[in-house]
Amino acid sequence: MGVKQVVQGQYQTIVDRAAGATAGLAVPSEGWVRTVRKALGMSGAQLARRMQVTRGAVNQLEHAEPNGAVTLNALQKAAEAMGCRLVYAIVPPGAVDTLIHDQAERKARALVLAAGRHMALEDQTLAPDRIKAQIDLQAQELARAMPADFWDGP
């Protein structure tokens, strides 16, 4: 195993750990700023004073967050004003290996079926079980080698 694979494995561990830690977490419908503020029993005016902004700015922030129209800096400032910390992550729905396996299978299926179409033109089609075996074999090889074009296409 090369250095590149070791480093990739370390990154996978970090992402898998974050995915596990956030598995049951969902963004509240009102957004985190309003939810935490209400949990603390803090008024919008009080948060505005702590953030050194207007009440209107807090209202705007609380309406923008659920729509995804807020900056990380604004969330950070609100979190600090409420005595909290901002945590953000991009995590897959499951393990990183699952994403890699799924991509390898899609890519392998496209490659094997394209080859099958060419073979059919020469009247040399494979049985469905042989096609499945070829897809599985190709997917394993793609997941292992992860060529430069791995994430391109299917």
What are these regions (language model features)?
Residues 62-67, 73-77, 93-94:
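Amphipathic, hydrophobic secondary-structure cores in small proteins
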Residues 3-4, 31-50:
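Short basic helix-loop element that most often maps to the first helix and adjoining turn
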Residues 28, 39, 67-70:
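Helix-turn-helix/winged-helix DNA-binding modules
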Residues 72-88:
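DNA major-groove recognition helix of helix-turn-helix/homeodomain DNA-binding modules
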Residues 51-69:
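Recognition helix of helix-turn-helix/homeodomain-like DNA-binding domains
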Residues 83-99:
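Short C-terminal boundary/hinge segments that cap the last helix of small helical domains
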Residues 1-28, 97-154:
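N-terminal flexible/basic segments that precede or flank functional cores
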